[in-house]
Amino acid sequence: MGEIDKIKPWRVVYSSSAAKQKKKLPGPIVAQLASLTWDLEQHGPVQPDWSHYSPLRKGRDIPANAHHCHIKSGRPTYVVCWQVVDKTIKIIEIFYVGTHENAPY
């Protein structure tokens, strides 16, 4: 069973607010988000190959086990924030997707 768990992909879900934010994104940003989502599903929450990736410190608006990266640099910069909801059954929740200026960190 241990080997099966290693190859089992992560499940990526969106919080209700992130799902609404996603609907407002320009097409090229949605494509970048889809690419990041695929990487999260295949490789898990740690994504060092994405621009400005880092874990986030828990805070008032930041849950524990949170991470972020930039999916578009320049003006405006677009950011995605996600958290590990369950390591055992491999669930990641994207809780923010939008411009850097409105990011919760």
Question: How would you label these PLM feature ranges?
Answer:
Residues 29, 37, 41-44, 73, ...:
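Generic secondary-structure microfeatures
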Residues 42-73:
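A short, surface-exposed loop/turn module that caps and links secondary-structure elements
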Residues 1-7, 20, 70-105:
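Enriched for short, Lys/Arg-rich terminal
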Residues 1-40:
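Arg/Lys-rich, positively charged N-terminal/basic patches that mediate binding to nucleic acids
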